[in-house]
Amino acid sequence: MKRRVVITGLGIVSPVGNDLTTAWDNIVNGRSGISRITRFDPSAITTHIAGEVKDFDISTYISSKEARQMDTFIHYGLAAGMQAWRDCGLEVTEANAERIGVIVGSGIGGLPRIEETQVEYLSKGPRRISPFFVPGSLINLISGHLSIAYGMKGPSYAVVSACTTGLHCIGDAARLIEYGDADVMVAGGAESTVSPLGIGGFAAMRALSTRNDDPQTASRPWDRDRDGFVLGEGAGVLVLEEYEHAKKRGARIYGEFVGYGMSSDAHHITAPDKDGPRRGIVNALRNGGLNLEDIQYVNAHGTSTPLGDKNETDALKLAFGDHAKKLVVNSTKSMTGHLLGAAGGIEAVFTTLAVYNQVSPPTINIFNQDPECDLDYCANEARQMKIDVGLSNSFGFGGTNGSMAVRRV
């Protein structure tokens, strides 16, 4: 028999804020975190905008010496993980250490550090390569550092599945608890690819918005004039806990992780296919023993791409049938941009807060809704509403899909 899993801690680093209170306030009030890129000169690239993390100081979490040994994506993951752990109010002890684990992943990992090290190598030779280059770039090192920092001796690894990474990490962590391999898991995703290669690579694919003159309206899911996604960065991390374990210690419970579904399109490396996401959604509902009518809110993948937004709309209609018209569907990417491997992490945070606070954040920048995208997208204003169960979707290159459900407790 599966054990129940609840969410007892949340942490976030994002373009809309580097703590839970700030980020949620900005999301609910429809404030965009997208602006012109400041980290490097993007003028040679067609896209000049991104959702950068601002005013972030890693030295408030770890020493400057430690920080220099890590790429920025690890900084973000550590910070969000430490926030979530503090939020849950649990201490690691000799008695419980082996029952607490970490699964925090990244879609791409240490790209800026790889770029910088390549420049050093070409200009000054191999002797200038830092001995921390490899461990500072590895994707599983967020989990490793969190495990070491707190003495967590349970399962520790990372999932890598492009833009579904964060959700897959959370779903896998929940299953470890459900089937008895752990009692508590720290899980989510982190990413930092606002760099020449990161922006340049996606621009070469013509995947990014080029609305450079108006950054805050560039990410516009389901709008008729959407022209691509906006790259974002940051991290979102949850603490998942076995229900009786959390209840016994009097923990605050944000919601119950109640369903997890996965699927593959088996179609194309980048082009979407509506049947794959449909099956992922249906699998999540089946896993949670949920009926279609149990779901009121969907935090959609909603990237603001011409093909992707219509495809997700079609998948939702296929999965939910007539009930799709009753769903409130929201894309927080309209404010944060697309955080790639961290997207499922921060969107799990936002989905959990939507259920906990009984409010759907808005999808901003819907000026002219695409007639082919004909669901209720909570356009431009947040909405107080009853949410018994919220669903979050993530889809990634290679046709990998994930959906998770959070129930009000």
What are these regions (language model features)?
Residues 1-66, 88, 244-256, 349-363, ...:
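ACP-dependent fatty acid/polyketide chain-elongation machinery
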Residues 1-2, 36-79, 85, 109-172, ...:
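Conserved catalytic cysteine-centered active-site region
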Residues 4-8, 35, 213-288, 297:
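Condensing-enzyme catalytic core mediating Claisen C-C bond formation in acyl metabolism
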Residues 9, 27, 81, 102, ...:
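Conserved small-residue
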Residues 74-96, 101-106:
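Feature captures the FAD/FMN-dependent oxidoreductase FAD-binding
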Residues 84-96, 246-250, 281-297, 319-323:
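Phosphate/pyrophosphate-binding loops at sites that engage ATP/ADP/AMP, CoA/4′-phosphopantetheine
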Residues 123-130, 171, 175, 179, ...:
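Glycine-/small-residue-rich "gating" segment that lines the acyl/pantetheine channel
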Residues 266-277, 303-320, 339-346:
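Short glycine/threonine-rich loop-to-helix capping motif typified by GTGT followed
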